[in-house]
Amino acid sequence: MSLRSPLSKVKGLGSAKEGTGHWWMQRVTALALVVLGFWFMISLVVIGNFGYEHTVVWLSLPLNAVLLSSFVMTLLYHSKLGIQIVIEDYVSPPAWKVGSLLFSVFVHLLLAVTGVFSILRISAGGLS
């Protein structure tokens, strides 16, 4: 016996069976952001002087470059997950919903590539 009406079965309304994975990834990325954010704040205190030379030296350490890249990618993935939920819940017209989701993915991907490329470029010897 099903609790769904025949009309809802035909329309395909109901669970998409993907909510748990999305919910779980939001929690995992939030936990990773707490850890990476704590590392980033400690690193800012350790740097002390935010001059260009000090920042390049700090970022030239491979561990710092990897952790900062992880921080940027995790932050943007977490943001993408949250914005996806807002779009799915509050944008009604299907064309706007699909367009908004595609635009969100494009912007987040562009920001991630730009951020990681910038970190790698600076860590490989600065901008000179």
Name the predicted role of every residue range.
Residues 1-128:
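Membrane-embedded alpha-helical bundles that constitute the cytochrome b-like, heme-associated redox core
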